[in-house]
């Protein structure tokens, strides 16, 4: 069973999921990290960027992610084109994960799903959205040295009802709420998660 975890930049998705992986031992995967792996020389993502955007965006080791990001983030049509070109890679990866976790729970952080709901939703059994107070989000993004307004526009607002977990307190508290939801799934007839640990 695959559970998608979505939310805008700065809400703490990665931190919460890493906490869940470390302390509750759920398998956790990150779509962004998968794409970054695909950007290595010799991988499909590297070839796509080089062929479709030009050799100036790659070096002998990998895609120059910083240069590519500066280019596509300032041109929405090009960002959409990049997303559409890499989408089949992500979908094939999700197919593999879905086959691997038919009777166990795994979580996948995939924020871009909110932009391409119909393309990614069929791969997941459930969806969890992480939200956070706007002031905390801005502080988190500024600490990362990114353009707050630009980054917040990258991910669309949800257009469908999604279970939402608020991350305004501690990472542990947010992770607890998520794992309580996962526990309810594990206890249902949908799947069996052999290594689940009940939050204390």
Curated annotation (Swiss-Prot):
Picking any one GO molecular function of the record gives: dephospho-CoA kinase activity
Q: Which Pfam families match?
A: CoaE
What is a single cellular component term in the Gene Ontology annotation? cytoplasm
Q: Which Gene3D superfamilies does the UniProt record give?
A: P-loop containing nucleotide triphosphate hydrolases
Pathway recorded for this protein? Cofactor biosynthesis; coenzyme A biosynthesis; CoA from (R)-pantothenate: step 5/5
Tell me where on the tree of life, at the top rank, the source sits: Bacteria
E.C. designation(s): 2.7.1.24
Q: Does the keyword Disulfide bond apply?
A: no
Q: Which residue spans traverse the membrane?
A: none
A biological process term (GO) from this entry? coenzyme A biosynthetic process
SUPFAM superfamilies from the xrefs?
Answer: P-loop containing nucleoside triphosphate hydrolases
- Primary residence: cytoplasm
Query: What NCBIfam families does this protein's entry cite?
Result: dephospho-CoA kinase
Q: What does this protein do?
A: Catalyzes the phosphorylation of the 3'-hydroxyl group of dephosphocoenzyme A to form coenzyme A.
Name of the protein this chain belongs to = Dephospho-CoA kinase
What gene name is given for the protein in this entry? coaE
């Amino acid at each position: 069973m695959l559970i998608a975890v979505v939310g805008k930049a700065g809400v703490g998705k990665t931190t919460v999921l890493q906490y869940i992986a470390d302390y509750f031992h759920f398998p956790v995967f990150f779509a962004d990290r998968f794409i970054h792996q695909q950007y290595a020389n010799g991988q499909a993502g590297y070839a796509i960027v080089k062929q479709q955007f030009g050799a100036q965006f790659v070096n002998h080791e990998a895609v120059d992610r910083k240069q590519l990001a500066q280019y596509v983030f300032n041109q929405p049509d090009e960002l959409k084109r990049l997303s559409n070109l890499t989408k089949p890679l992500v979908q094939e990866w999700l197919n593999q994960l879905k086959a691997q976790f038919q009777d166990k729970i795994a979580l996948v952080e995939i924020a871009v799903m909110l932009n391409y709901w119909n393309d990614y939703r069929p791969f997941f059994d459930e969806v969890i959205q992480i939200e956070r107070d706007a002031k905390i989000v801005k502080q988190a993004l500024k600490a990362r040295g990114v353009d707050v307004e630009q980054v917040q526009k990258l991910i669309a607002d949800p257009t469908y009802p999604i279970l939402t977990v608020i991350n305004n307190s501690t990472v542990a508290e947010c992770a607890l709420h998520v794992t309580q939801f996962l526990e309810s799934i594990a206890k249902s007839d949908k799947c069996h998660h052999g290594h689940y640990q009940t939050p204390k």
